[in-house]
UniProtKB/Swiss-Prot annotation:
It comes from the Bacteria. One of its GO terms (biological process) is regulation of DNA-templated transcription. This is Putative methyltransferase Rv1407. InterPro entries: MeTrfase_RsmB-F_NOP2_cat, MeTrfase_RsmB-F_NOP2_dom, NusB-like_sf, NusB_RsmB_TIM44, RCMT, RsmB-like_N, RsmB/NOL1/NOP2-like_CS, SAM-dependent_MTases_sf. GO terms for molecular function: RNA binding; RNA methyltransferase activity.
Length: 457
């Protein structure tokens, strides 16, 4: 089943719904990123104000809720979603999201979607869309969940995953990471559906957080001394960001970079290394803080595009950039402080990437865990005795966090430091340690993990 070829199109979707639909198609057909495609479409077409806000809600909400929407669509259509034409399926997702999770009038949600189906296809396909959406509109989300979700008593994790539109394996990974606090699972999953504030980082020695907050009409952050919150807006248009006085960076990432500089190291000679530097936000913070103690940062990044971003974000700072694989750098060992912000599944930042929860697969974990262990081993080899490695990920998956650290402790002459004091007293109540796991529902940050290791010999 493919879209038909026809004459001039009539009665297209309104601009907001059209932008949302085209973004959904880009995500489905080209593996594009909604948070990159949609803003460009809105700017190109001059869509602003309420229309832009509506398009954003439809796009990001539909991307996040895809699994739940597909289950409802499949039940209403009495066929597998995979058997439905991909273009029709995206239209159905857009319509179903409006019916179940917005206050849009049901008639408007159905009629606009059916009209677009008639433009994209023919009357028969439009009739199919009409029938499915009218069936869905006959019940609210709670009713559909009650019918389709796993039983909450027999499968609480599966039930929570369905209700909050996450793949079950991700909900299980969060539950495993929470451990004794598994009762917070629903709060973790719900936080992924909340639109996060934009976090900025004031460049140390250039601008204070207070000065930045006044310049951009934001709010000084709760934890990082560099953080400023913006409720919404395009940070790339802000003068301090354009001029290099501030960076767009989650507050948790700021705390990770700061933690490395606070780790106790006797006889610090100022040789610092960022082994996984792209896109350069943490490198810039390290270099800015390093200026206060005459430290120099070596940044390693193999990706050409990400290396270019490192160069852009660290211009004017004492940073040496090497465009090589962090596992094979040919660098002379002896670094005092090494940051390994390892490539990961990004499960801790799903709230910032609407489609990511459905794009990631369980098989990704094993490949990334292998890479993470290799990078951590390389970092330890480059660290001098008495020096510190800070290992971090923006994923709470145990294979990517405590699993990687446990592997390093078994195979290398390192000792795990209590990482909590490097975050306290800024953040209290970090648990039993020795490592730190931040959570969006507790701290308002991405779910960053951090572990500090001291090399012994």
């Amino acid at each position: 089943m493919t879209p038909r070829s026809r004459g001039p199109r009539r009665r297209p979707l309104d601009p907001a719904r059209r932008a949302a639909f085209e973004t959904l198609r880009a995500v489905s057909a080209r593996d594009a990123y909604a948070n990159l495609v949609l803003p460009a479409l809105l700017a190109q077409r001059g869509i602003g104000g309420r229309d832009a806000a509506f398009a954003t809600e439809l796009t990001y909400g539909t991307c996040r809720a895809r699994g739940l929407l597909d289950a409802v669509i499949g039940a209403a259509a009495e066929r597998s979603p995979q058997a439905i034409d991909p273009v029709l399926l995206d239209l159905l997702r857009l319509g179903t999201y409006q019916l179940l999770r917005t206050r849009v009038d049901a008639h408007a949600a159905v009629s606009t979607t059916v009209e677009q189906a008639g433009i994209e296809f023919d009357s028969a396909r439009a009739g199919f869309v009409n029938g499915v959406l009218r069936t869905i509109a006959g019940r609210d989300e709670r009713s559909w969940v009650g019918e389709l979700a796993p039983d909450a008593q027999n499968d609480p994790i599966g039930h929570a995953a369905f209700v909050h539109a996450h793949p079950r394996w991700i909900a299980q990974a969060f539950a495993d990471a929470l451990g004794a606090a598994v009762g917070e699972l629903e709060a973790v999953l719900a936080s992924d559906d909340e639109r996060p504030a934009v976090h900025l980082a004031a460049r140390p020695g250039v601008l204070t957080a207070g000065e930045l907050a006044r310049a951009v009409r934001g709010t000084v952050g709760r934890y990082s001394p560099f953080a400023v919150y913006l409720p919404r807006g395009d940070p790339g248009r802000l003068a301090p960001v354009r001029d290099g006085q501030a960076l767009v960076q989650d507050e948790g990432s700021q705390l990770v970079a700061r933690a490395l500089t606070l780790a106790p190291v006797d006889g610090d000679t100022g040789r610092w290394l960022d082994l996984c530097a792209g896109p350069g936000g943490k490198t810039a913070l390290l270099a800015g803080l390093g200026l206060q103690c005459a430290a120099r940062v070596t940044a390693v990044e193999p990706s050409p595009h990400r290396a270019d971003l490192v160069a852009q974000n660290t211009r004017g700072l004492p940073v040496e950039l090497l465009r090589v694989d962090g596992r094979h750098t040919d660098l002379d060992p002896g670094f005092d402080r090494v940051l390994v912000d390892a490539p990961c599944t990004g499960l801790g930042a799903l709230r910032r990437r609407p489609e990511a929860r459905w794009r990631r697969q369980p098989a990704d974990v094993a490949a990334l865990a292998k890479l993470q262990r290799e990078l951590l081993s390389a970092a330890i080899a480059l660290t001098r005795p008495g020096g510190v490695v800070l290992y971090a990920t923006c994923s709470p998956h145990l294979a990517e966090t405590v699993g990687a650290v446990a592997d390093a402790l078994r195979r290398h002459p390192v000792h795990a430091l209590d990482t909590r004091p490097l975050f306290e007293p800024v953040i209290a109540g970090l648990g039993e340690g020795p490592h730190v796991q931040l959570w969006p529902h507790r701290h308002g940050t991405d779910a960053m993990f951090a572990a500090a290791l001291r090399r012994l010999t």
